[in-house]
């Protein structure tokens, strides 16, 4: 069975891992880094992904980052006149991860386990699966990030039973999961979180502070200047990271903008104390989900054996201090917060292929599922933190006499009223025979698969008529749309490959022109003038072709010039060899005389030496 890669598709950074020799290994990207920025840029019809796109963001307005925050919504990015859904942008990132994983493994990769925040709803999970499909990946499993982290942490600790709390604060989302580990079973007891809390929010607090300080000093609002804002974003992220290791950092942005008197510079010293003050409310927001997870698992802080930190934002000292204070124990520092999720996904891939044995993963659904019933109430069928896969049925009836159809409004959430919860989808069970209200028996069944994706079925028990849907949110893509996006992605991959080949062809042609000029100088007076003119004409033709975009012509002229230069070089070497041979022959005739003279003199000198001795 082909290898299944594990992908952590993050808000700010992504990573890919594979199981090798029973161990999960992070695959470095072409730049040698172990994580790749989740950034996509479009420039002159070309796509850039990762560090290249992130570096160019200051000057390229067509740069997209943190797209994960829009997964499962109708959000669209319009770039160069074309609309892109979050699934398509995510697919571009996945395609890039897939391509360098293939280069590393030396084989085609078409299967993956992709992680999502535990608190992702059905629409967000479905969107992630669609992104994988667009990227040319068969998504074998969608796995929760904290669960993946627990897998990576607990693989070598299966002998002892322990309860662990995974605290996952990434670039855009926050999750807390509590798991029981023992005898190779990883059982999730509860999960809670906040999909709108992450490192991006900490960065924004610094940006807002810098904008306010600059406005106070100079009367100019930098938030209206796109280029300045991008520079502030990069500086804020760097300052945040610096303050995890030092207590004060200097933010210096020369020529950030211009005033009436000329260029203006931003110089601010940010202390850790000020950063903690700015982000205090964000850190506080991690406490409620942590307490909720403990409550749902019927545990207290003292029942937790180990606290695992996941996500780059857990490096913030105030975050670590809050966890320590809340749970009364030092967090475990033995895992890399940026890599552990991808490694866990790779291990899950190994479980699927059978390379990892004696491991059972029991995850839960993060939010309750139900339908809207009379009075706009949400009636829950599956409670949150129910182990998945699972299914549940309940019988309902009509609300009016002779009601011909029932609308099934599928909901996900914890609020008592339907309008306050997330709509997953709607469908209708029609052709119900006329009957007084309360008589027809309508059975509604919910199924949640191992990926946390929901199927709902409604059946009229009287007629046996049935209707079912795999939930597609309002943002969900149809099979036709996905197929079109798959084709677009494949075409783009081909185009990217072609662009790379064309760039290499152009570089080789440029190099050849340079080499020819050098060679012709060396050949002056050594080969016939006619041969030199022929080479110069071919060189000029290639230079002319290089001014255009006809790559077939460039290729043809390059090959033609190459052939002429090779023939010239052969003639030069033949001529040099002939000259050497002629010189060698002349030396051969003179050599005996010279040898006699030298030998005679040498003999005499030696004799004199002997006599002197």
UniProtKB/Swiss-Prot annotation:
Record InterPro entries: ATPase_NBD (IPR043129), Chaperone_DnaK (IPR012725), Heat_shock_70_CS (IPR018181), HSP70_C_sf (IPR029048), HSP70_peptide-bd_sf (IPR029047), Hsp_70_fam (IPR013126)
Keyword Nucleotide-binding set for record: yes
Induction notes from the record: By stress conditions e.g. heat shock.
Entry keyword set: ATP-binding, Chaperone, Nucleotide-binding, Phosphoprotein, Stress response
UniProt GO molecular function: ATP binding; ATP-dependent protein folding chaperone; unfolded protein binding
Phosphothreonine PTM positions: 173
Biased composition (Acidic residues): 596-613
Disordered, as annotated region: 578-613
Pfam family for this entry, one: HSP70
Superkingdom of this protein's organism: Bacteria
Presence of the UniProt keyword Phosphoprotein in the record: yes
HAMAP family, per database record: DnaK
Family of this protein: Belongs to the heat shock protein 70 family.
Biological role: Acts as a chaperone.
Protein name according to UniProt: Chaperone protein DnaK
Organism expressing this protein natively: Listeria monocytogenes serotype 4b (strain F2365)
Lineage of origin: Bacteria, Bacillati, Bacillota, Bacilli, Bacillales
Name of the gene this protein is made from: dnaK
């Amino acid at each position: 069975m082909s290898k299944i890669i594990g992908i952590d598709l993050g808000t700010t950074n992504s990573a890919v891992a594979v199981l090798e020799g029973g161990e999960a290994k992070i695959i470095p990207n072409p730049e040698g880094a172990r994580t790749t920025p989740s950034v996509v840029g479009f420039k002159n019809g070309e796509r850039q992904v990762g560090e290249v796109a992130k570096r160019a963001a200051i000057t390229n307005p067509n740069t997209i980052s943190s797209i994960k925050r829009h997964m499962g919504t109708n959000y669209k990015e319009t770039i160069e006149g074309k609309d892109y859904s979050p699934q398509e942008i995510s697919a571009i990132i996945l395609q890039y991860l897939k391509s360098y994983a293939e280069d590393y493994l030396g084989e085609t990769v078409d299967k993956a386990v992709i992680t999502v925040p535990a608190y992702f709803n059905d629409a967000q999970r479905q969107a992630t699966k669609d992104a994988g499909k667009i990227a040319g990946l068969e998504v074998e499993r969608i796995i929760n990030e904290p669960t993946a982290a627990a897998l990576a942490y607990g693989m070598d600790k299966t002998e002892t039973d322990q309860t662990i709390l995974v605290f996952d604060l990434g670039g855009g989302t926050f999750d807390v999961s509590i798991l029981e580990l023992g005898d190779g079973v990883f059982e999730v007891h509860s999960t809670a979180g906040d999909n709108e809390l992450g490192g991006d929010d900490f960065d924004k607090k610094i940006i807002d502070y810098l904008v306010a300080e600059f406005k106070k000093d100079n009367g100019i609002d930098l938030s209206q200047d796109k280029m300045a804002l991008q520079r502030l974003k990069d500086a804020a992220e760097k300052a945040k990271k610096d303050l995890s290791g030092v207590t004060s950092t200097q933010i210096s942005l020369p020529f950030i903008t211009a005033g009436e008197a000329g260029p203006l510079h931003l110089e601010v010293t940010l202390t850790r104390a000020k950063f903690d003050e700015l982000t205090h409310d964000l850190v506080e927001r991690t406490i409620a989900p942590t307490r909720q997870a403990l409550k749902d698992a019927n545990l207290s802080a003292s029942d937790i054996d180990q606290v695992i930190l996941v996500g780059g934002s857990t490096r913030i000292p105030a975050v670590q201090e809050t966890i320590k204070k809340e749970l009364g124990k030092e967090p475990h520092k033995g895992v890399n917060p940026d890599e552990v999720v991808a490694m866990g996904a790779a291990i899950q891939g190994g479980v699927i292929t059978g390379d990892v044995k004696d491991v059972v993963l029991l995850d839960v659904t993060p939010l309750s599922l139900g339908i809207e019933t009379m009075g706009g109430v949400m009636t829950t069928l599956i409670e949150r933190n129910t182990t998945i896969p699972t299914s549940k049925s309940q019988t309902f009836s009509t609300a009016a006499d002779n009601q011909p159809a029932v609308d099934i409004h599928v909901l996900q959430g914890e609020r008592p009223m339907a309008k306050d919860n997330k709509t997953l989808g709607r469908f209708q069970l029609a052709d119900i025979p006329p009957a007084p209200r309360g008589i027809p028996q309508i059975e509604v069944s919910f199924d949640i698969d191992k990926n946390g994706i929901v199927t709902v079925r409604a059946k009229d028990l009287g007629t046996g008529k049935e209707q079912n849907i795999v939930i597609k949110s309002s943002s969900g893509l149809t099979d036709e749309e996905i197929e079109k996006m798959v084709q677009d992605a494949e075409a783009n991959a081909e185009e990217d490959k072609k662009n790379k080949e064309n760039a290499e062809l152009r570089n080789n042609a440029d190099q050849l022109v340079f080499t020819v000029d050098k060679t012709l100088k060396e050949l002056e007076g050594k080969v016939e003038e006619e041969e030199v003119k022929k080479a110069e004409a071919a060189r000029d033709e290639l230079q002319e072709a290089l001014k255009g975009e006809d790559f077939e012509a460039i290729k043809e002229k390059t090959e033609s010039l190459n052939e002429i230069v090779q023939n010239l070089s052969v003639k030069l070497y033949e001529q040099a060899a002939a000259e050497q041979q002629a010189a060698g022959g002349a030396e051969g005739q003179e050599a005996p005389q010279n040898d006699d003279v030298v030998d005679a003199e040498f003999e005499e000198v030696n004799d004199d030496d002997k006599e002197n001795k």
